[in-house]
From Swiss-Prot:
Protein name as catalogued: 2'-5'-oligoadenylate synthase-like protein 1
CDD domains: NT_2-5OAS_ClassI-CCAase, Ubl1_OASL
Keyword Repeat belongs to the record: yes
Family label: Belongs to the 2-5A synthase family.
Amino acid sequence: MAVAQELYGFPASKLDSFVAQWLQPTREWKEEVLETVQTVEQFLRQENFREDRGPARDVRVLKVLKVGCFGNGTVLRSTTDVELVVFLSCFHSFQEEAKHHQAVLRLIQKRMYYCQELMDLGLSNLSVTNRVPSSLIFTIQTRETWETITVTVVPAYRALGPSCPSSEVYANLIKANGYPGNFSPSFSELQRNFVKHRPTKLKSLLRLVKHWYQQYVRDKCPRANLPPLYALELLTVYAWEAGTREDANFRLDEGLATVMELLQDHELLCIYWTKHYTLQHPVIEACVRRQLRGQRPIILDPADPTNNVAEGYRWDIVAQRANQCLKQDCCYDNRDSPVPSWRVKRAPDIQVTVQEWGHSDLTFWVNPYEPIKKLKEKIQLSQGYLGLQRLSFQEPGGERQLIRSHCTLAYYGIFCDTHICLLDTISPEIQVFVKNPDGRSHAYAIHPLDYVLNLKQQIEDRQGLRCQEQRLEFQGHILEDWFDFKSYGIQDSVTVILSKTTEGAAPFVPS
């Protein structure tokens, strides 16, 4: 019976045996494939790619890296696809790579036809693909069994040094403004190591998920625009990290059931890592926050913050197939009960810092899908507020927004650490936002019948700008000191514009 027919009929308790018997490649087969591919690597390292003119006048191969399943140690027995990333000396920036990528591909393609060692291996089907990024793809055959191997070669700019990448490397990547994933090969070593150094048991789970995906999704829907295997790998790693707290000993059936359940909830997924890039850098922070506000599912490449590897694919088809998998023997125990899954949140918890003028900051761990009401309950228990809690937030470059109790942080697109403003009001007080010239806004509590001067005094106390130097404006009307707010039709959570009335006024005090 074909392997593709056996997973669904295999008992959940024996999935370890299934992986060992059907998915784990033999050492002899793997060595034969890698020995054949080594001929390609030697050609790339030793060939002189000089041209009389153009970007390839002096091209040296700095490094050849095996990536994909052969690189990270999760290859399936049936896999005959090998991916190589070639770092070249002629690329000195992401912009140069984008400009000369096609020319270098054509040069390598032309030189391959003159390599006798590759011709002896049956080099054929040599072409340049239009994928992102574009690459050189061809087939060769192993020396002993003459099994056909498909090799993909991607030239790349070597952006990384021997140590961890600096924030400036990622800032330059973001500023290069390439198509998402176009420069990911420059970070392929980080992508490979993200999986390569994981426990053996996790690699077994990765093989199991990839086998399921290949046999029961891709082969059944060959024309559909399905997610890349890399997205499934990252989702599986996240499930293991969150579900077992990175325990090397776990049950494969529980891991498989967990991944299938996550795939069913693909519209809620928002997953990212900050191992290689930090949100402390403003350019990186803006990029990541923008990505996390996108349409879900979101699975950010841990090595490339510009690349949501889950974007634009038919996840609905994958979800349907995952639902079918959960009904099979591989997801049922010996008592004919569904295998329990791990408790894995669809987005990781984030740190929320609650700030209130005149009080110490409060810090809470909150899940983006929890109702805001729960956060307010935590604040209430922490501080014992008597009034009405008014929470608001402001993204860089955006307007301050009121956060409503029945909503979630996810509703506002908040999926990473954030600061929230707290204002405690007592009825009939209302909240107004005062927007400074620099774009930042602050929340103030006012009584609708208070004079405008009362708000100006609060602004002076907090920001240091004297009342006589302030001009407040609402809907095109300048607010006069001795008029009340009700007379201007000012209601709860509206924004009032603050500006200076005289030259040389004291600067705003950062808050």
